[in-house]
Amino acid sequence: MPHVITQSCCNDASCVFACPVNCIHPTPDEPGFATSEMLYIDPVACVDCGACVTACPVSAIAPNTRLDFEQLPFVEINASYYPKRPAGVKLAPTSKLAPVTPAAEVRVRRQPLTVAVVGSGPAAMYAADELLVQQGVQVNVFEKLPTPYGLVRSGVAPDHQNTKRVTRLFDRIAGHRRFRFYLNVEIGKHLGHAELLAHHHAVLYAVGAPDDRRLTIDGMGLPGTGTATELVAWLNGHPDFNDLPVDLSHERVVIIGNGNVALDVARVLAADPHELAATDIADHALSALRNSAVREVVVAARRGPAHSAFTLPELIGLTAGADVVLDPGDHQRVLDDLAIVADPLTRNKLEILSTLGDGSAPARRVGRPRIRLAYRLTPRRVLGQRRAGGVQFSVTGTDELRQLDAGLVLTSIGYRGKPIPDLPFDEQAALVPNDGGRVIDPGTGEPVPGAYVAGWIKRGPTGFIGTNKSCSMQTVQALVADFNDGRLTDPVATPTALDQLVQARQPQAIGCAGWRAIDAAEIARGSADGRVRNKFTDVAEMLAAATSAPKEPLRRRVLARLRDLGQPIVLTVPL
């Protein structure tokens, strides 16, 4: 009964290190790890111990006998990653474990290491976790929104609740006694980089890539145009996108680009609102989908089927739950690519695409929109005068023009980082120049003292949620090495002074207790309607919920004050 990794794999590799026989690959030290779409369990080497199940933060692993029908393709996907061996042959258990990168060891100094982390998404939380392994390290996480966890909260599709379970791990990290949240505090507005450095040894920026790459064709910007990432944020109740004008009163939506985000949007637009009602989808989005007139979602790509940007797990998830079709011309392109492509992963995608119909057969899901995957279409302009009415494409590599009428046109062509005040920025690469996480002055090539980056702002928008774990670990290793070598300046202000500064600049800052109050209130609201949670989508509502949080215990406040004063802390234990 070997175990199987399924669609929601986040690539954080906790399962790799939990496995006693090293049967999960690629491991973080292997070349393919950074670009792998998921991790894979070797069914021949697996000893069925289940250690990986409890280690996985997103519940992506199960015995092969407990898979849902839609998950069955992952049995072969896991197995096909490994060489073919005779059926029934079981490998002997091995004592060779995946190599573990040791945690960065912080040397004791007069002042314990104190780090500010800007951002609260996966890269930020994994960095905090790595730092808190060491005794005495204090981590303060700053987030401009009243709620943490970045794209896990606002960028993962509502119907991917397993993926969102990684927030349980993040909540455990945030519960550490040397961890503090400063939510609803924007760096660059309420506090500056220099002020953070005055209160910390180092500042680690894990702010992601918050902007979209824009498609510069005529008509983009008309009402009825937007980006897929904006729509996902709207679906998830991000307060900055509450009022996003999403017009679903027309029969067709066109999405330009065919990565995973494009598939997420197509899948949700075609989903049954009754099924979505059990998720954490925002109320305004659920209402709009219930009244949607959309009958078709077209996902258009410039290149051919062999160059599809979506991952194999996402394609499997899409075709398992929606009516997905290809035009006859695109079906022939799939067959042509199958005849020449050798890469196993690409062939797996093409084989699934080759099974899709052309839409002439009766719909599998009566009354639901169908999804059409279209290839070799290069967008030329958005049609319409006062609002979008469709898209004009050319067939890639030719002068042939094609037109698709649509009432909503979305682009999904990638994310882009944006400049951070007081730090250098590479406009072309859209990231902060760095060497292994150390921010580098591009003029001199020298490190910027006390400044570090992790996640997408460090490496660009690549990888998956768990990819940020190894990325953040590398940055923390560099930061700790600099601290140990005396290259980081001790903070000149006390923790209490930081609290006072934050309170003066942003009286509505929210701490860990406030976040727990918001979280509990959302879960309670959802529970009343049989939902995972019912999110607050307005900042004022979040702030009101946060005020119900209990005050920090007097004992903890006294201990914090004694630490500020440098007084010894003596605990009396009754005999």
From Swiss-Prot:
Binding site for FAD: A123, E143, L151, I187, W456, G463, F464, I465
Signal peptide interval: none
Entry keyword set: 4Fe-4S, Electron transport, FAD, Flavoprotein, Iron, Iron-sulfur, Metal-binding, NADP, Oxidoreductase, Repeat, Transport
EC class name: oxidoreductase
Reaction equation(s) it catalyzes: 2 reduced [2Fe-2S]-[ferredoxin] + NADP(+) + H(+) = 2 oxidized [2Fe-2S]-[ferredoxin] + NADPH
MF terms in GO: 4 iron, 4 sulfur cluster binding; ferredoxin-NADP+ reductase activity; metal ion binding; oxidoreductase activity
PROSITE patterns attached to this UniProt entry: 4FE4S_FER_1, 4FE4S_FER_2
Binding site for [4Fe-4S] cluster 2: C46, C49, C52, C56
Region Ferredoxin--NADP reductase, annotated ranges: 115-575
Protein name: Probable ferredoxin/ferredoxin--NADP reductase
Family indicated by similarity: In the C-terminal section; belongs to the ferredoxin--NADP reductase family.
Cofactor(s) needed by this chain: [4Fe-4S] cluster; FAD
Binding site for NADP(+): R213, N258, G259, N260, V261, R302, R303, E314, G463
Manner of cofactor binding, per the entry note: Binds 1 or 2 [4Fe-4S] clusters.
PANTHER family on file: GLUTAMATE SYNTHASE 1 [NADH], CHLOROPLASTIC-LIKE
